[in-house]
UniProtKB/Swiss-Prot annotation:
Any one GO biological process: flagellated sperm motility
Taxonomic lineage: Eukaryota, Metazoa, Chordata, Craniata, Vertebrata
Superkingdom of the source species: Eukaryota
Modified sites of kind Phosphotyrosine: 372
Name of the protein in its database record: Tektin-like protein 1
Subunit-level organization: Microtubule inner protein component of sperm flagellar doublet microtubules.
Chain's gene name: Tektl1
């Protein structure tokens, strides 16, 4: 048992030893004490808790008491009113007799198996890099898969847009055919009307739709090139990462499930609740997830979102233009049908007028012939001997009456006046008949023009309905655009070619 020596702190005058001797002894003792503390601390520096550094400004025993306070058991109240002591949570060795649980100590060097530990750490680093490469390859592969899906959707939408653009171009050809076919009407039927205005309006609208569809095709082509370039970049980085994990048997989808998501581009999808998702590793120039991979994934995400918006806009434009083109075509056909109905009404009215005029001409001709017969009867016979006795002016009764002055008979004068009046009436009838025939011919020609105009409008409507059918392609509609008049026979070269 140690014996406590009496204190050597006495009055300076009562000391026997020299002051230098006392100071030398105290210095030696202090040096030994510091060496003891340092050696004691250094003895456990290779094996101690991580947070075992005490505050130098606090007394050693107070710092140690504060440091050991969290080790003690905690008293908890039970529902029945009793108490129970439980060790604190966390790692450590539970000392049930001392009611304490000190934290686990960690060695700075894994002695005595330092070589094995370093080899294991190296293997862990290599496996961590392989896992990172596999996870990055899985994310790159899934991003490439989604970009491929978006490429397929974009190609399908481009085909639909191209078909709609072909329909718009075919509509322009049909409009040109309609204008050209309506140009074969007679001159009197070429007076500008609302149908011509509708055809001009249709042409302008179709040109506007064509420009819009061509812009959509240019946008989709640029997006297609960007998606293809992004896919190639993702494929290059994915194949580069797969070189490090080529011999691993864990599928890439399983790696994504371990990461807590089924996609690395579409981050809007909630993670799978059954697995604990791994955090996105920060880009490391010398690691598996390089800044180039991060940039490629960010570009894929941006292109995916942009392509979704562009695809929706392209589909909307395609449907709108289809409806607009159908509406414009219906309005043009309705205007042509209205013009046909108006032409048919005029044809019926002109046919009735032509029939009435024909009857009038027949009656006038009959009356004119009767007037000529009457004029011949009024003139009398050509020979004097054919005159009747009552028509002779030299008969005895007339000669006896005309013997006195002023008793001349007006028979001859009145006969001459009546004959002249009948002659003038016949001439007027001839003039009226000539005018009636001229008007009849003009009316018949106008009726024929109306019939041709009606037939041309009917052919235009029929042509439009036939050419606008979806089964008629652009090349078939283009064959009808020729430079020769369809009312004339085609050139011999074309005839010979067709016969062959």
């Amino acid at each position: 048992m140690p014996v406590l020596l009496p204190s050597t702190d006495r009055d300076q005058d009562s000391r026997v030893g020299a002051p230098e001797w006392h100071q030398a002894a105290k210095a030696t003792s202090r040096k030994a004490h510091l060496l003891t503390d340092r050696c004691g601390k250094e003895a456990v520096t290779m094996w101690q808790p991580k947070d075992s550094v005490l505050d130098p400004n606090v007394a050693h025993h107070l710092g140690r008491a504060a440091y050991m306070e969290p080790w003690r058991f905690r008293v908890e109240m039970l529902k029945g009113g009793g108490t129970v002591e439980k060790p604190p949570p966390g790692e450590g060795v539970t000392l049930w007799k001392g009611k304490m649980k000190p934290p686990a100590w960690y060695a700075r060097l894994p002695l005595p198996m330092h070589r094995d530990a370093r080899a294991q750490q190296t293997a862990e680093v290599v496996h961590a890099h392989a896992r990172g490469a596999r996870l990055t390859a899985a994310r790159l592969g899934r991003a490439q898969h989604q970009i491929n899906g978006q490429l397929r959707l974009l190609l399908r939408q481009r085909e639909a847009t191209d078909r709609r653009l072909s329909e718009v171009r075919k509509g322009l050809l049909i409009n040109e055919q309609s204008v050209k076919l309506r140009g074969y009407r007679p001159k009197c039927e070429k007076i500008p009307d609302k149908a011509d205005s509708m055809l001009v309006w249709e042409r302008e609208e179709l040109k506007s739709m064509k420009r819009k569809m061509e812009k959509d095709m240019e946008r989709s082509e640029a997006l297609l090139k960007a998606l293809a370039s992004c896919r190639d970049t993702l494929d290059f980085y994915c194949q580069e990462r797969l070189q490090a994990v080529g011999l691993m048997n864990q599928p890439l989808d399983k790696v994504l499930e371990q990461a807590g998501r089924h996609s690395w581009v579409d981050i809007t999808r909630p993670p799978t609740p059954r697995t604990q998702g791994l955090k996105t590793p920060p880009p490391d120039p010398v690691g598996a997830y390089t800044p180039a991979c991060a940039k490629a994934l960010f570009e894929a995400k941006r292109l995916l979102m942009e392509s979704k918006d562009i695809l929706a806009e392209l589909a909307k434009n395609e449907v709108d233009i289809q409806n607009q083109q159908q509406e414009i075509s219906d309005r043009v056909c309705n205007s042509l049908a209205q013009k046909m109905r108006e032409t048919l009404e005029l044809k019926e009215r002109m046919t009735m007028t032509l029939g009435l005029m024909r009857g009038t001409i027949h009656r006038c001709m009959k009356f004119n012939q009767e007037m000529y017969v009457t004029r011949g009867l009024i003139k009398g016979p050509l020979l004097k001997r054919d005159l009747e006795a009552r028509e002779k002016l030299n008969r005895p009764l007339v000669r006896m009456y005309q013997r006195h002055v002023g008793t001349q008979l007006p028979e001859a004068t009145r006969l001459a006046q009546g004959t002249d009046l009948l002659t003038r009436h016949n001439l007027q009838m001839e003039k009226n008949l000539k005018e009636l025939r001229t008007t009849h011919d003009n009316l018949a020609w106008s009726l024929n023009c109306k019939k041709i105009g009606h037939d041309v409008d009917y052919d235009v409507v029929r042509l439009r309905l036939r050419q606008l059918h979806p089964h008629v392609c652009y090349e078939q509609a283009k064959r009808l655009i020729n430079d020769w008049d369809p009312r004339t026979p085609p050139p011999c070269s074309r005839t010979n070619t067709s016969s062959k």
